[in-house]
UniProtKB/Swiss-Prot annotation:
Group of enzyme by EC: transferase
Any one GO molecular function term: 2-isopropylmalate synthase activity
One Gene Ontology term, aspect cellular component: cytoplasm
Protein's name in the database: 2-isopropylmalate synthase
GO terms of biological process kind: L-leucine biosynthetic process
Organism expressing this protein natively: Prochlorococcus marinus (strain MIT 9313)
Pathway linked to the protein: Amino-acid biosynthesis; L-leucine biosynthesis; L-leucine from 3-methyl-2-oxobutanoate: step 1/4
PROSITE patterns recorded: AIPM_HOMOCIT_SYNTH_1, AIPM_HOMOCIT_SYNTH_2, PYR_CT
One Pfam short name: HMGL-like
Biological classification of the source: Bacteria, Bacillati, Cyanobacteriota, Cyanophyceae, Synechococcales
Length: 540
């Protein structure tokens, strides 16, 4: 049987596979903020990125290894294709972390071997032990993935896995790369691996799933029963195409149904010992942070973290919940950190009170960042009577987005009405501090603002999405605006919040422009789509 750590290990790949969602690119400071929150959440492994992809990816993984990795913190992991260059870059990037891992992979399905790698099974079987052994010579912890394992020939899969373990892999990951399999099939695949790989007792079985058929979490829960003990997932289920298995759904399924799953870990059904190390009360906060920074809006009916997840419209349901919440709720909202708590802070509140509350919310700001956050708080308090935790989160998450700013919005002013043509005037500052002014008319105030900003920025783009929602209830609520721009097939998201949605839209547009400027011209390699390297072709 495979190694059994006695519980489920949560491997978070939000910063690697999750960031591959179109438009979800993150800058270094945003990645660091998410990694720090993932550590507070209690994940076991953070896959911080794909270091060989670009200098930016390398720097982000290295910074996370330096600042988030620790003796008691999560393992910091980097992804590497089965090539020496990838593996060496990965080892260098994760080197600062006391607990570090290289995650290397190669495809094993016939369709990938024929059309992507153009290699025979024998060639792949020769590459695997060589590259795993090389990775093992650089770090003590190596994970190996058989890309597209769910569509691979099981007998060949067993051979590859046996060779990888013999070469030093301590974790074997079985990905359903294209979201093709079903729960019963996936469970049988994991059980077959556990049974037919002779040295499987020397490694942990991990699984990685995509949600193309909406089955990722269901597949994972079946894999638990068959011996899988590490699960690779993302916050809010973000990822390529239909996304990845959602961390919050998997963790809460194991939490709510632990009486059912406990026996598969050799426990009594009523054992109170948690099946994961995740601090569930941090789930909602983590979900909001990832949504804010990536611009990926969480659908209202999303399980666990959607805005309607704990809402009841039916009168019968409302009556039952008022009498006993367990009549229609299987999860206490407080378990996942959902609270209506309002903080008693206002325009007379001091800097220390704001700092204390931000620390309680999990934000560790530098003096400069705190000064800026406090200034924004005071400005908001002048316009809004009650300040909520959501308001503070919106303030801080927007600050993080502005760390790589070529453009700074200095002023936005609009005039519009039933008999007026919407007109906007904006002032935009460049990196050198030089300010420029432009005015434009549009079909509405937001359109006019975007036209004026584009006239100053001079960066070709196409606006493909504009969305706005309220942070909290009330007529003075902050409005959250998300904007997506497209250029040369790439998507760039911007996000902002303000009590004035036109101001929020202007800032969100500027944030998206800054991402566009930073991202164009330095597109990163994709670990799967760019998997064929010259050295891989030569068998190195």
């Amino acid at each position: 049987m495979a190694k059994d750590p006695g519980r489920v290990l949560i491997f978070d790949t939000t910063l690697r596979d999750g960031e591959q969602s179109p438009g979800a690119s993150l800058n270094l400071e945003e990645k660091l903020a998410i990694a720090q929150q993932l550590a507070r959440l209690g994940v076991d492994v953070i896959e911080a990125g794909f270091p060989f992809a670009s200098q930016g990816d390398f720097a982000a993984v290295q910074r996370i290894a330096q600042q988030v990795g620790g003796d008691e913190g999560p393992i910091i992991c980097g992804l590497a294709r089965a090539s020496r260059a990838d593996i060496k870059a990965c080892a260098d990037a994760v080197a600062p972390a006391p607990r570090r891992r290289i995650h290397t992979f190669i495809a094993t399905s016939d369709i990938h071997l024929e059309h992507k790698l153009r290699k025979s099974r024998a060639e792949v079987l020769a590459i695997v032990p060589e590259m795993v052994a090389y990775a093992r010579s650089l770090v003590d912890d190596v994970e190996f993935s058989c890309e597209d394992a769910a569509r691979s020939d099981p007998e060949f899969l067993y051979e590859v896995i046996e060779a990888a373990i013999a070469a030093g892999a301590g974790t074997i990951n079985i990905p359903d790369t294209v979201g093709f399999t079903t729960p019963s099939e996936f469970g049988a695949l994991i059980a077959g691996i556990d049974c037919h790989v002779p040295n499987m007792n020397e490694a942990v079985i991990s699984v990685h799933g995509h949600n193309d058929l909406g089955l990722a979490v269901a597949n994972f829960l079946e894999a638990v029963k068959s011996g899988a003990r590490q699960f690779e997932c993302t916050i809010n289920g973000i990822g390529e195409r239909a996304g990845n298995a959602a961390l919050e759904e998997l963790v809460m399924a194991l939490y709510v149904r632990r009486r059912y799953f406990n026996p598969f870990f050799g426990r009594e059904p009523d054992s109170p010992t948690p099946l994961t190390a995740v601090r569930t009360e941090e789930i909602t906060k983590t979900s909001r942070l990832v949504s804010n920074l990536t611009g990926m809006v969480v659908q209202p009916n999303k399980a666990i973290v959607g805005s309607n997840a704990f809402a009841h419209e039916s009168g019968i349901h409302q009556d039952g919940v008022l009498k006993n919440r367990l009549t229609y709720e299987i999860v206490d909202a407080r378990t996942v950190g959902l609270s209506d708590n309002r903080i008693s802070l206002g325009k007379l509140s001091g800097r220390s009170a704001v700092r204390a509350r931000l620390e309680e919310l999990g934000y560790d700001l530098t003096r400069e960042d705190l000064d800026e956050a406090f200034a924004r708080f005071k400005d908001l308090a002048d316009r809004k009577r009650d300040i909520t935790d959501r308001d503070l989160e919106a303030i801080v998450s927007e600050q993080v987005q502005q760390s790589e700013a070529r453009f700074q919005l200095r002023l936005v002013q609009v005039s519009c009405g039933s008999s007026l043509r919407p007109t906007a005037t904006v002032i935009l500052a460049q990196e050198d501090g030089q300010e420029q002014t432009a005015a434009a008319v549009g079909t509405g105030p937001v359109d006019a603002v975007c036209r004026a900003l584009n006239a100053l920025a001079g960066e070709p783009n196409e606006l493909i999405e504009f969305s706005v929602k309220s942070v909290t209830e009330g007529i003075d609520a902050m409005g959250e605006v998300t904007i997506r721009l497209r250029r040369d097939g790439q998507l760039f998201s911007g996000h902002s919040a303000d009590t004035d949605v036109v101001v929020a839209a202007a800032q969100a547009f500027v944030n998206a422009l800054n991402r566009l400027v930073a991202g164009c011209g330095r597109q990163s390699l994709h670990p799967q789509h760019d998997a064929v390297l010259a050295d891989l072709r030569s068998g190195i």
